[in-house]
Amino acid sequence: MLQYALVFFVIALIAAIFGFGGIAAGAVEIAKILFFIFLVVALVAAVMGLVRRGR
């Protein structure tokens, strides 16, 4: 589960680079939304991984 958190985090970083860096000027809003969605999913996956590891 922690691997999913890392994958989602990397995808969120890539979306942020494209969205906030001006490379994809037409898709800035979409990149911002995807960044926060993937960030939340990554955090949830990280917490779930830590909870499952504790059992």
Curated annotation (Swiss-Prot):
Q: Name any GO cellular component annotation.
A: plasma membrane
Membrane topology label: Multi-pass membrane protein
Give UniProt keywords alphabetically.
Cell membrane, Membrane, Transmembrane, Transmembrane helix
**Which Pfam families does the annotation name?**
DUF1328 (PF07043)
> What is the annotated localization of this protein?
Cell membrane
Transmembrane region positions?
5-25, 30-50
Tagged with keyword Methyltransferase: no
Zinc-finger among keywords: no
Read off the InterPro entries from this record: DUF1328 (IPR009760)
NCBIfam families reported in the protein's UniProt record: PRK13682.1-1, PRK13682.1-4
> Per the similarity annotation, which family is this?
Belongs to the UPF0391 family.
Protein's name in the database: UPF0391 membrane protein H16_A0156
